[in-house]
């Protein structure tokens, strides 16, 4: 259990502080679209590498940029005037031992398929232009990757970087997460097709008062006029408020599209269900962390997990594993109320040998009596780390 440290939390719990802020960007937000397209490309490349070479090869396709298009939404319809442009950028092994990998063609195919499956009112063939820009990686990093892949050894860290995680979610975090999940669930969309996928939820708590502000792109073809829009918006607001109130004892207020000006009929309607059609651009790494939230009152890493290779890229693996360790410590040790986990690597060293694994816990019990069990959990997850890539390929771990 070398380099595993267990320390007490010496600061006030976030949920007991006077103020707290939590955010989540939904699946149709331009930043989240970029995250998912980058990750889907990494998964597709990984599977193709395994098929062709028997192992995942070097790649990092973690740079994506969405340039918003132009659209003219009107009640009852509208049109996309100029398409969205999406640049998928990164590094990937494109040839090995005479075998070529069609990385850019794969990027286009994967992106169109994901958009078709997830943004219902967006036509990936006419509303979007996919522009892949994928080049080979640097020789030293490719060689580092091949060094352990060819020998079947524990992957070596491709960077000196860190990951962090925490558990459990508090009530504001759960409300923000569950609000977006509800509004973007298949059952909700079936009953409320006018709600688009571009949903951003901001939760603010001041003492025991919670304010949830939702930016929700309504789909114009399902909204007849301004009165219909206002009635539908109020209906959604009440549903969210009822759900949110069931998750907390605190007082909850819900607001939707607060920039609307009904008198001028200037409201948040879109043709496609995403502001990417005109109002907003997007980029990998500007949205949710691997637990699906943006939590400025908690420890966070600025690393973008999406699109990074799942075998040795610390910015991806350590953030997920840190959350797993924190979650297991809280769920398996009854006396632990809260846990934070911090992991840091050293480039070129085995990924399961971090420079430090610091687990901070909040407990009313003597920490010494729990230390061995906490270290055991952390060690178990470190030992599993060389197999973590399988769960990314099976989409068991989220990156946004």
UniProtKB/Swiss-Prot annotation:
In the record, biological process GO terms are:
one-carbon metabolic process; S-adenosylmethionine biosynthetic process
Record-listed ATP binding positions: 135-140
- What GO MF terms are annotated? ATP binding; magnesium ion binding; methionine adenosyltransferase activity
> What are the protein's UniProt keywords?
ATP-binding, Magnesium, Nucleotide-binding, One-carbon metabolism, Transferase
| Reactions catalysed | L-methionine + ATP + H2O = S-adenosyl-L-methionine + phosphate + diphosphate
The coenzyme or cofactor needed here is:
Mg(2+)
Would you indicate the residue range of the signal peptide? Answer: none
* Pathway terms, separated by semicolons: Amino-acid biosynthesis; S-adenosyl-L-methionine biosynthesis; S-adenosyl-L-methionine from L-methionine: step 1/1
Recorded family membership = Belongs to the AdoMet synthase 2 family.
What does the function comment of this entry state? Catalyzes the formation of S-adenosylmethionine from methionine and ATP.
Q: Can you name this protein?
A: Probable S-adenosylmethionine synthase
Species assigned in the record: Aquifex aeolicus (strain VF5)
Q: What is this protein's gene name?
A: mat
């Amino acid at each position: 259990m070398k380099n595993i440290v267990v320390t007490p939390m010496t600061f006030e719990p976030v949920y007991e502080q006077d103020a707290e802020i939590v955010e989540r960007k939904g699946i149709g937000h331009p930043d989240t679209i970029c995250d998912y397209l980058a990750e889907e490309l990494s998964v597709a490349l990984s599977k193709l590498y395994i098929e062709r070479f028997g192992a995942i090869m070097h790649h990092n396709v973690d740079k994506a940029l969405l340039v918003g298009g132009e659209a003219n939404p009107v009640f009852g319809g509208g049109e996309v005037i100029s398409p969205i442009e999406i640049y998928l950028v990164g590094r990937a092994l494109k040839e090995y031992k005479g075998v070529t990998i069609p990385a850019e063609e794969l990027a286009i195919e994967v992106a169109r398929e994901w958009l078709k499956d997830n943004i219902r009112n967006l036509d990936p063939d006419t509303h979007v232009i996919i522009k892949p820009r994928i080049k080979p990686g640097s020789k030293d990093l490719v060689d580092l990757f091949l060094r352990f892949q060819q020998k079947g050894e524990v992957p070596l860290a491709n960077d000196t970087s860190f990951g962090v995680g925490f558990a459990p979610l508090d009530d504001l975090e759960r409300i923000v997460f569950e609000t977006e999940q509800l509004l973007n669930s298949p059952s909700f969309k079936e009953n409320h097709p006018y709600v688009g996928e571009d949903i951003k939820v901001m939760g603010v708590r001041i003492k025991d008062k919670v304010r949830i502000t939702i930016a929700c792109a309504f789909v114009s073809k399902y909204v007849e006029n301004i009165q219909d829009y206002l009635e539908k918006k109020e209906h959604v607001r009440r549903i969210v408020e009822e759900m949110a109130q069931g998750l907390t004892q605190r007082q909850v207020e819900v607001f939707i599209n607060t920039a609307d000006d009904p008198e001028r009929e200037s409201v948040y309607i879109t043709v496609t269900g995403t502001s990417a059609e005109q109002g907003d651009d997007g980029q990998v790494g500007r949205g949710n962390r691997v637990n699906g939230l943006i939590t400025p009152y908690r420890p966070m890493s600025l690393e973008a997990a999406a699109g990074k290779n799942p075998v040795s890229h610390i910015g991806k693996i350590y953030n997920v594993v840190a959350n797993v360790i924190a979650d297991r410590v809280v769920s398996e040790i009854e006396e632990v109320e809260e846990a934070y986990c911090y992991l840091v690597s050293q480039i070129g060293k085995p990924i399961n040998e971090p420079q430090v694994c610091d687990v901070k816990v909040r407990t009313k019990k003597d920490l010494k009596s729990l230390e061995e069990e906490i270290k055991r959990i952390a060690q178990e997850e470190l030992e599993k780390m060389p197999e973590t890539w399988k769960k990314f390929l099976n989409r068991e771990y989220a990156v946004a």
